[in-house]
Regions:
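Conserved non-cysteine loop/helix-boundary elements of the Radical SAM core domain that shape
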Residues: 1-105, 111-114
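Short flexible/disordered coil segments
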Residues: 6-18, 45-51, 74-77, 108-121, ...
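Short coil/turn linker and secondary-structure boundary residues
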Residues: 15, 27, 58, 116-119, ...
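Generic alpha-helical secondary structure signal
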Residues: 18, 30, 34, 61, ...
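A short, terminal or domain-edge coil/loop segment
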Residues: 33-43, 64-73, 101-110, 130-144, ...
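Contiguous mid-protein beta-loop-alpha structural module that forms a pocket-lining wall or clamp
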Residues: 70-77, 81-176
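Radical SAM enzyme core and accessory elements
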Residues: 129-269
Length: 269
């Protein structure tokens, strides 16, 4: 199967058994995990997992558990959506059992449930923005993984805190380089973070996802060693640049290595 030809959307919605029962679904999550992992080994199919906030019996704690479980599957995208109470939906038609508040106009998005307060839904919306920028975009995968591991944060806590900081900072429409600087400064302030290792992760992320080969100012370091490294790479037949192919080169100070990327093709998955 040609890589990128097929995208699978997997509607997990929740991993909370009480929620799954309330929405009249049956799900063997162990089986879902097995299938997702098997497909991932082929490296040719884009997998998109969906979670829905606002479902019955799903509070912030249990949604966090669903988020962490879904995130651990490592799909290319983890979509954090919000329940829409369309006409005919049980939570709309049975207000005694599901006393929810939702917007009067389409798409009738949930605003409050017996299990989630409006301010908690705001927390999740901010987390969604951070998740889109860092994970679903594919731009900061190594950065997020390093920061979570070093600071000892679960994915849910990490993205909730990052989203809240982004909302305070006003990152909604800022350019990528500015968001990179914001993310670096925010992660650098977390406990357990080594700034050199954090920069290493961000450099690898930026070089892997930006075919200009250019690093933003916040990651740029003036160092004569870089010029020498570029020269040595060019002189070695095994690492010499290909004619007409753009290359990005950087020094990694945490691991004391040189990293380079030749932009010959894009991962279609």
């Amino acid at each position: 199967l040609r890589p990128g030809l097929v995208q699978l959307e997997i509607g997990v919605q929740s991993t909370n058994p009480q929620t799954i029962e309330a929405i009249h679904r049956k799900m063997d999550f162990g089986r879902v995990t097995e299938i997702v992992n098997r497909i991932a080994k082929g490296r040719n199919i884009h997998q998109h997992l969906d979670l829905i906030a606002g479902l019955p019996h799903e509070d912030l704690r249990t949604f966090g558990e669903s988020f962490n479980t879904g995130y651990a599957l490592g799909a290319q995208m983890l979509q954090l959506g919000f329940l829409k109470l369309l006409h005919g939906a049980a939570m709309r038609e049975e207000p005694e059992e599901f006393p929810c508040v939702f917007s009067e106009d389409p798409p009738y998005e949930v605003q409050k449930t017996p299990w989630l307060l409006p301010e908690e839904l705001d927390v999740l919306r901010a987390a969604e923005d951070a998740l889109e920028r860092c994970y679903n975009s594919g731009r900061f995968l190594e950065t997020a993984a390093y920061a979570m591991a070093a600071a000892g944060l679960s994915p849910f806590v990490f993205y909730c805190r990052l989203g809240a900081a982004g909302a305070r900072h006003g990152t909604a429409n800022i350019p990528l380089d500015d968001y990179t600087a914001f993310l670096y400064n925010w992660c650098a302030a977390l406990p357990g973070i080594d700034k050199a290792c954090l920069r290493d992760a961000m450099v690898r992320d930026r070089l892997a996802t930006n075919s200009t080969g250019r690093l933003p100012q916040c990651l740029h370091v003036t160092d004569a060693l870089l010029g020498r490294a570029v020269k040595r790479l060019a002189q070695n037949p095994a690492t010499a640049p290909l004619p007409g192919v753009r290359r990005g080169v950087a020094l990694l100070y945490g691991t004391r290595q040189v990293v380079f990327v030749d932009y010959t093709q894009k991962n279609p998955v």
